[in-house]
Amino acid sequence: MLFRSPTAIDLRLILSVIKVSANLERIGDYSKNMAKRTSVLLQMREIDNAASSLRRLAKEVELMLKDALDAYIQRDPERALEVINKDKDVDQMYNGMFRQFLTFMMEDPRNITACMHLHFIAKNIERMGDHVTNLAEIVYYLVKGEIIEHVRPKGDRTSFTVVRPEDSD
């Protein structure tokens, strides 16, 4: 590149490498945080179905990451779009888990500590999915030279969740 003028694709490639590495670093940060929380959870009693729900969520994000990296290597914008579309599924799974953890905490206060750690692990996995979606958007931009013009809605509906304890009357 030093012996010629850089083209648009050259500049997009440089930009994509920088952005991809930043997103992968954040995914690594979330993984580290999850490992710390897991060591605490090992000392607590197991919450019904929580482990299998987390595994399903993590598997979905893992497959998205594989597809996003494959799209990057193969410069495949269609595969990148498929990854972007899967983000909604991850958000829905996370929102369901959030409600599930709230239910477990309300049913038995002894579940609160474990459910909070599980919630943060699920949130970390959901955020990993968001970073994987960023990777897919970067791939699309790299190949097509176009920024995807959709505004990604925040799939996390937990900010609007209201829990009302049952009346004691």
Please describe what each predicted stretch is.
Residues 1-169:
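Cytosolic, long alpha-helical scaffolding segments
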